[in-house]
Curated annotation (Swiss-Prot):
GO cellular component, one term: ribonucleoprotein complex
Molecular-function annotations in GO: structural constituent of ribosome
Protein family membership: Belongs to the bacterial ribosomal protein bL28 family.
Name of the protein in question: Large ribosomal subunit protein bL28
Organism: Thermomicrobium roseum (strain ATCC 27502 / DSM 5159 / P-2)
Keyword Ribonucleoprotein: yes
Matching Pfam families: Ribosomal_L28
Gene assigned in the entry: rpmB
InterPro entries noted in UniProt: Bacterial_rp_bL28 (IPR050096), Ribosomal_bL28 (IPR026569), Ribosomal_bL28/bL31-like_sf (IPR034704), Ribosomal_bL28_bact-type (IPR001383), Ribosomal_bL28_sf (IPR037147)
Keywords: Ribonucleoprotein, Ribosomal protein
Coiled coil: none
Length: 63
């Protein structure tokens, strides 16, 4: 399952809505990337959503 290991973001469910307003079920999946992150000086491979990845880059730039 596509799930972020940092924030726990999971797929959400909703509808595709056609022009005639028919609704069919669909799944909104988070954009999860496999990235090597350095936590406490130890590199670790994690599946992280791009929102968390962006935040990590931002925090690293400010530090």
């Amino acid at each position: 399952m596509a799930m972020c290991e940092l924030c726990g973001k999971k797929p959400m469910f909703g509808h595709n809505v056609s022009h005639s307003n028919r609704k069919t079920n669909r799944k909104f999946k988070p954009n999860v990337q496999r990235v090597t992150v350095i936590l406490n000086g130890v590199p670790k491979r994690m599946r992280i959503c791009t929102r968390c990845l962006r935040t990590l880059y931002k925090e690293a730039r400010e530090a």
